[in-house]
């Protein structure tokens, strides 16, 4: 009986997901109408399953990866890469490039909006739907929506901010555009609300639990808030949120056995997308198969991120460098070991929180505490002396650069590198713009390098264009001015 109920919920969630797959142009497919759905708490739970299913869909997960990696330095291209991929890598992005396709992300956002809009209707109709269950479902939908908007705002800056769902023809409206600052304020507001509604954990257990790792928990919301506050350069709030995660005592580093993190089952995971029991891993085709478009940038990884050790430790290796490459093939095999199609995509894990906290502490003048966190992480990962800058606690800028170097080692191929480099570059009103100039110098083909350097000095170029087809659909959308030149 339990199996039947579970599959019914999954099926209903799938129908909901598919019924709204044209959100941004606001053309609903009227699969499940308001009158037919939203009558019981099971309907709301099914909608929540649909939300998480939309995150695991190929287009969403692949866009999270490409937005966070393709313009950076750790992922390169193979001969199977598309022309659009090559244009992105050479910083010659057009408004027709598929990297600017946000439709799958907005479909997932619409699923969140529908739950937020109509869960109250189910609560009124179903007396068994408790206030706690209702708040939890709403909180998770708010948190997932915020997570997706945070990716969008860092990728495009000024975007449509849709807070109401589209489920029928009369819902069709032109939503226009909100500034990046407005979007970030909404994200913060929603995450703080979710923090009140979402429980600490969904399953009360001291060890790893797939439900706790696969659904948004209160620590996951705190990790998102810390990430948002880093982007906003509000370091006292980063310190506050990361401290509360550490205070749970629940999370810990497992040491050098990195494949275990991505294979599932460790207490490093705060929030993940699980593919443990499915061979339909959307990352497999773009990073591992023979005709994959993306490859590890082996030269930069081996020479800059994971250089060889020196002196008496010449035979020692950073466990993180050993874990991300399959020999010299360039496969993106961080996500799994012998069977890379069964990886878990880590959205937030404990080491990420430690590094966010270390950065905030350094920005707040607490260099000794920041270095202690870095030392703890490096010791567990068996980091080598060649990557230890031997910084004093008073060298706060040096510590911050050390943190970013450790983020490159720790979070390789996790969809975060471009956003890290952009965040470092734009800090203090773009005081570090040369971070991006140096990046372009390393990754862009020589024949177009100077042109790319000139482009990257324009801060508008750091955000993707609105796809041309979206501009045709909604006349209120305005193109990023860089792409009008």
Which residue ranges define each predicted feature?
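Bacterial Sec-dependent N-terminal signal peptides
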Residues: 1-28
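Long, intrinsically disordered, low-complexity segments
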Residues: 20, 64, 76-78, 92, ...
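Membrane-proximal, proline-rich intrinsically disordered regions
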Residues: 20-68, 91-94, 242, 256-261, ...
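Short, surface-exposed recognition loops and adjoining beta-strand edges that mediate ligand/DNA contacts
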Residues: 35, 61-82, 162-164, 171, ...
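Conserved, well-structured interaction surfaces
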Residues: 45-46, 53-54, 59, 81-156, ...
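Flexible, polar/acidic helix-loop-strand segments at domain edges
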Residues: 87, 299-350, 356
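Structural register within alpha-helical repeat arrays
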Residues: 138, 145, 152, 218, ...
